[in-house]
């Protein structure tokens, strides 16, 4: 019996030892990483793209129609025609368009037959008649929400004051308003008493209606901005330079620049530097025009003289400089000359353009030589010259 118990105890100890050995080896086995590769990854990704690109091929569960869902009645009511994304303040300015529509607060209950549960009827719309005054169309777009539209309010108030001054039979309350184009403190004062303050009236339409009774001399055509450009003095000095002596630059209360001439004790809107530049441009244009006329006259005179003298000698060539002066080239001697080779007398000193003789002097010499040649042709010298002075007087 003892032998059996000892054998069983030895067996149990061996089993426990083996278990302990496995526990000691377990951390070593955990270092072995297992890599699993899913071969269907590309197919699954392609299936996702196909479900988006081809929605008809994908199997979608059936959805409940909108009418069968528990949605409020306002979900199926279309918006008002004047309510759009283009309006810059739909909830504020468009509230006046719905002011004439009132919804009944009390919902009528309809009793169903056969003991069914009562159903609340849809509230009916009660449309009230429009007010007596005719309302203008509302066209408040985003383009008019800029600060430049403040000038339109400025013009509207100015025209209303002018109309009240021209019409003595108008409402006295409107004539008690202070004259001058001031902005209203409350926007509700600009609208009729029957219309809500939140309703927006088209400013352009109001300007058109009011301008029909105002003369053309009082109408303002330039609405949205000033008719002058506000430029800093530093920028003007950089572009145009300093002011001439005796001039000073100043500004009005509105910021418009004007100029004072302390010499003549006068003021003007135009910049004297711009006026000086314009005068310089005019003078330059006149000088260029005069030079063109002079060059044309030179070329015409030179061509006329050349045609009367006949062709050039052999080896000579006629050319013109960049400034329009005429000179001659001798290809035989390889020299240049201002003198016409067809006229050999009186110009031997001016044989080279390096002498820098002005073209006007050359033309004067040419004209004097031509005049002498013409006189010799018309009045040939007589071989017998009498000593009597009367002959010289007659001839």
From Swiss-Prot:
Effect of residue 145 to A: Increased activity and nuclear localization, decreased sensitivity to Hpo/Wts-mediated inhibition, loss of interaction with 14-3-3epsilon and 14-3-3zeta
Subcellular location: Cytoplasm; Nucleus
Compositionally biased intervals (Polar residues): 84-100
Every WW domain range: 241-274, 310-343
Keyword Acyltransferase in annotation: no
Region (Disordered): 73-100, 129-150, 162-199
GO molecular function, one term: kinase binding
GO BP term, pick one: positive regulation of growth
Compositionally biased region (Low complexity): 162-179
Impact after mutating residue 146 to A: Abolished phosphorylation by Cdk7, leading to increased ubiquitination by the DCX(DCAF12) complex
Modified residues (Phosphotyrosine): 228
Primary location class: cytoplasm
Alphabetical keyword list: Activator, Cytoplasm, Nucleus, Phosphoprotein, Proto-oncogene, Repeat, Transcription, Transcription regulation, Ubl conjugation
Protein function: Transcriptional coactivator which is the critical downstream regulatory target in the Hippo/SWH (Sav/Wts/Hpo) signaling pathway that plays a pivotal role in organ size control and tumor suppression by restricting proliferation and promoting apoptosis. The core of this pathway is composed of a kinase cascade wherein Hippo (Hpo), in complex with its regulatory protein Salvador (Sav), phosphorylates and activates Warts (Wts) in complex with its regulatory protein Mats, which in turn phosphorylates and inactivates the Yorkie (Yki) oncoprotein.
Protein name: Transcriptional coactivator yorkie
UniProt lineage: Eukaryota, Metazoa, Ecdysozoa, Arthropoda, Hexapoda
């Amino acid at each position: 019996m003892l032998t059996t118990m000892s054998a069983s105890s030895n067996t149990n100890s061996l089993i426990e030892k083996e278990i302990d050995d496995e526990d000691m080896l377990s951390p070593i086995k955990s270092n072995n990483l297992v890599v699993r590769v899913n071969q269907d990854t590309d197919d699954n990704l392609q299936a996702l793209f196909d479900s988006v690109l081809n929605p008809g091929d994908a199997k979608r569960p059936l959805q409940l129609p909108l009418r069968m869902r528990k949605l409020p009645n306002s979900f199926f009511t279309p918006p008002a025609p004047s309510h759009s994304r283009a309006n810059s303040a739909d909830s504020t300015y468009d509230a006046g368009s719905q002011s004439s529509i009132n919804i009944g607060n009390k919902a009528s209950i309809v009793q169903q037959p056969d003991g069914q549960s009562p159903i609340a009827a849809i509230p009916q719309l009660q449309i009230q008649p429009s007010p007596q005054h005719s309302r203008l169309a509302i066209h408040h777009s985003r383009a008019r929400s800029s600060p430049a539209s403040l000038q339109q309010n400025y013009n509207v108030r100015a025209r209303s004051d002018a109309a009240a001054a021209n019409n003595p039979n108008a409402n006295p309350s409107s004539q008690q308003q202070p004259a001058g184009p001031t902005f209203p403190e409350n926007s509700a004062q600009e609208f009729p008493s029957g219309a809500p303050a939140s309703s927006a009236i088209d400013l352009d339409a109001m300007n058109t209606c009011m301008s029909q009774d105002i003369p053309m001399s009082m109408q303002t055509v330039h609405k949205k901005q000033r008719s002058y450009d506000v430029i800093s003095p530093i920028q003007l000095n950089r572009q145009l330079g300093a002011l001439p002596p005796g001039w000073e630059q100043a500004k009005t209360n509105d910021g418009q620049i004007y100029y004072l001439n302390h010499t003549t004790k006068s003021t003007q809107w135009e910049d004297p530097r711009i006026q000086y530049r314009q005068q310089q441009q005019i003078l330059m244009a006149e000088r260029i025009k005069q030079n063109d006329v002079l060059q044309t006259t030179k070329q015409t005179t030179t061509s006329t003289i050349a045609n009367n003298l006949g062709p050039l000698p052999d080896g000579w060539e006629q050319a013109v400089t960049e400034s329009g002066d005429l000179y001659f080239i001798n290809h035989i001697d390889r020299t240049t000359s201002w003198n016409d080779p067809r006229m050999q007398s009186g110009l031997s000193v001016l044989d080279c353009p390096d002498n820098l003789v002005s073209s006007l002097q050359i033309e004067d010499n040419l004209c004097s030589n031509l005049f002498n040649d013409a006189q010799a042709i018309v009045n040939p010298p007589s071989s017998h010259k009498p000593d009597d002075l009367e002959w010289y007087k007659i001839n």
